[in-house]
């Protein structure tokens, strides 16, 4: 058991009831191009084309052989691009139930699959994109290998779904998925990371290693797991995958069909009935949240309130890796003498307002409660950083773009979500996730 003591469980209102319900029906889904770090698409479809579920939409030019497939059947209604023609989203109006089928196997056959059989089915179905590397958080090259594979079966993000509730319903598919992944690199460890008090189904596999984590957020982040179990570096890579994609892998290999259903948390202070809902990867979030939100100007976030993506316009869809939709109020109203008031209804990690001493949950908004200023090293980062790194020094090097110093201090182990708490507690209001990504891109390009 690994116990995480440094960190923060955000006391945010609107926690979801851990019971699965059917979500609003959606008739539009999309693949979000900017979710895939460094991806440059070679389009295989155009607007107006009718596609089947599992059909190839585009291939990554920079990672040949890695294809992205449709999560549902229907008509391509929009291919949205941003500056420099960066692909933002490929939108599908859902129609019919036509699908492409792939190789399938009996449960008994799964434990005898070759690495090539596993790889081929994952690539052809598009499920290869469920895997990501660390460092750099990219979809792995189909010719590459990993030191190990991590399966994350816990989630400590604010307002997250309890994985054990979801896995209770899909236990056989999850164990089948673990079996398949264990065959990808039979001689390499498959690490299953779960909460210490959770009841997660497992499989009797030779290379499966089970690890229990407990404590405050970020105990449930895969970056935390990798740091304590199999740390990475410039010459060492691991892969990781979330538990719902493991379910999809299990279903793919036993049914021959691409499984794109998601059970997500729909929660936050502005959600009328916070709960777990069934939906589909890439679901239109305006449709999914219709009649679900309190009145007022709200911000819908695909993912966690700490590190998710704003869902609007061409990005108004559930992300490929998102397991929650969070909704908070837009906090753009000015407060008279707000900086000097006791503020019993506001939360602070530095004891600057009375709300710090309260045990209640808070209706957080998008307000940063202050303006941008210089980075101030007052110990805030150290309180929320459980990894064996020096956060203040690392963040300073990230800000000034010192790639050599940042590498020495451990930036290659990190992803945007690993620095989300540092951004939250930062007195200078820096967004360290985007700064980290710029540095990682520079390191990958220049070394």
Swiss-Prot record:
Class in the EC hierarchy, top level: translocase
Annotated GO biological process: sodium ion transport
Keywords, ordered alphabetically: Ion transport, NAD, Sodium, Sodium transport, Translocase, Transport, Ubiquinone
EC number: 7.2.1.1
Xref: Pfam families: NQRA_2nd, NQRA_N, NQRA_SLBB
Recorded superkingdom: Bacteria
UniProt keyword Electron transport present: no
Catalytic activity: a ubiquinone + n Na(+)(in) + NADH + H(+) = a ubiquinol + n Na(+)(out) + NAD(+)
Alphabetized GO MF terms: oxidoreductase activity, acting on NAD(P)H, quinone or similar compound as acceptor
Listed NCBIfam families: nqrA, PRK05352.1-2
Entry's family note: Belongs to the NqrA family.
Subunit structure: Composed of six subunits; NqrA, NqrB, NqrC, NqrD, NqrE and NqrF.
Protein role: NQR complex catalyzes the reduction of ubiquinone-1 to ubiquinol by two successive reactions, coupled with the transport of Na(+) ions from the cytoplasm to the periplasm. NqrA to NqrE are probably involved in the second step, the conversion of ubisemiquinone to ubiquinol.
Name of the protein in question: Na(+)-translocating NADH-quinone reductase subunit A
Taxonomic source organism: Haemophilus influenzae (strain 86-028NP)
